[in-house]
């Protein structure tokens, strides 16, 4: 993998070489993506659609070519099924509002899982409060996998939608999405997928999965911030009302009422992030040039290597250890000192561990990772999370492990 394409990896933090292991929060950008942003603002910046002048036509072409590239990247039938958003959170909020307006009434139920990021919980809670509906969640088994038997019991005639994460942003575990979709579809229930942590790390084909909706972000897959995607099957998108009003999403506006644009534009009110979509297309080019087989093998090797190194450290507890993961590991460190209050092993606070790692140039994420219900289920205030990208290597992990051992020694 080409570390030299990522200029930020040459930065020094606290006079040390940067070891960036926070890719689940955001990824770094290859030079091709950075250059694309500069190119757009330097050579063809102009508002898109309806412009007859050259710059507008160039910008429009770049934006729509990016839409087609995204459609091909995830295996969509048509670029009309690709809605550009600000990111995964924006995509899920749009889905919750539009689907809720069309299909959710009092007493109806929506199912999520016990692993979800707040972005796949709160929009549904807001919808349920507005519509007097009910939000249910798939419980976790003791090994932190989803209880599929319990999920079968949750499905009923009242279930209107299932929305689940493909990969846990805390545990990194890959969920049995195919089985969830099959079970839901057998009951006539559509399924939305939070792909924020899967699309950057594995090949996702929406037609092969047969999911009805998919949300993901550009910034986690080596693209820029402020651009994301909501995929939806055409037959569903045509039934949903717009979630925002304004320019571009209209067909005609009269005092007597408004008619809406065709797909996908009826969901894209206002000036779109055409620079972001173009830069995202360059991130897709970068990923495809390396190839999914090589990327997945590389990140799987890193994850297994890191998990083995962590397991060898006394006091380290890895959550969902040995389960298939997509480049994310969460852990905590428990000392042998007994707590006078609980009479249990003392937890080294994740924030303290993360701070000492940062002082040694190692960037990780600590806390509840915007997944408080899951962290509550773990019975801890948070975790230390390491997450990998295609530019990481074993030297990064070795540096992290050495820094972690030093941090443990200092805190113990």
Predicted feature residues:
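Pyridoxal 5′-phosphate
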Residues: 1-412
């Amino acid at each position: 993998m080409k570390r030299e394409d990522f200029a930020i990896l040459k930065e020094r933090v606290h006079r040390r070489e940067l070891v960036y292991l926070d890719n689940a929060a955001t990824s770094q950008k290859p030079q091709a993506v950075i250059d694309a942003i500069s190119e757009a603002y330097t050579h063809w910046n102009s508002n898109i659609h309806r412009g007859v002048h050259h710059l507008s036509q160039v910008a429009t072409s770049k934006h729509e070519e990016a839409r087609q590239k995204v459609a091909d990247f995830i295996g969509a039938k048509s670029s009309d099924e690709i809605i550009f958003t600000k990111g995964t959170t924006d995509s899920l909020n749009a889905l919750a509002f539009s689907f809720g307006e069309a299909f959710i009434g009092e007493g109806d139920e929506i199912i999520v899982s016990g692993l979800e990021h707040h972005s796949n919980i709160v929009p549904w809670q807001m919808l349920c409060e507005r519509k007097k509906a009910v939000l249910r969640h798939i419980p976790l088994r003791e090994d932190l996998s989803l209880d599929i038997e319990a999920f079968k019991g949750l499905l009923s005639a009242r279930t209107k939608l299932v929305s689940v994460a493909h990969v846990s942003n805390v545990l990194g575990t890959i969920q049995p999405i195919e089985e969830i979709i099959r079970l839901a579809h057998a009951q006539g229930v559509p399924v939305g997928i939070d792909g924020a942590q899967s699309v950057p790390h594995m090949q996702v084909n929406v037609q092969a999965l047969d999911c009805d909706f998919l949300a993901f972000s550009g910034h986690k897959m080596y693209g820029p911030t402020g651009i994301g995607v909501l995929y939806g099957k055409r037959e569903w998108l045509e039934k949903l009302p717009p979630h925002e009003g304004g320019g571009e999403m209209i067909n005609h506006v009269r005092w007597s009422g408004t008619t809406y644009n065709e797909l996908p534009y009826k969901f894209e009110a206002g000036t779109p992030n055409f620079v972001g979509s173009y830069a995202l297309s360059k991130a897709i080019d970068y990923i495809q040039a390396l190839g999914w087989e090589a990327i997945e093998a590389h990140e799987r090797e890193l994850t297994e290597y890191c998990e083995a190194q962590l397991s060898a450290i006394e006091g380290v507890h890895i959550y969902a250890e040995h389960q298939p993961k997509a480049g994310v590991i969460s852990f905590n460190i428990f000392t042998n000192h007994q707590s006078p209050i609980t009479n249990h092993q003392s937890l080294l606070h994740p924030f303290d561990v993360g701070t000492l790692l940062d002082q040694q140039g190692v960037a990780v994420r600590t806390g509840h990772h915007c997944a408080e219900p899951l962290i509550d289920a773990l019975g801890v205030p948070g975790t230390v999370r390491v997450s990998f990208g295609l530019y990481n290597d074993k030297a990064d992990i070795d540096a992290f492990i050495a820094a972690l051992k030093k941090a443990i020694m200092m805190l113990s």
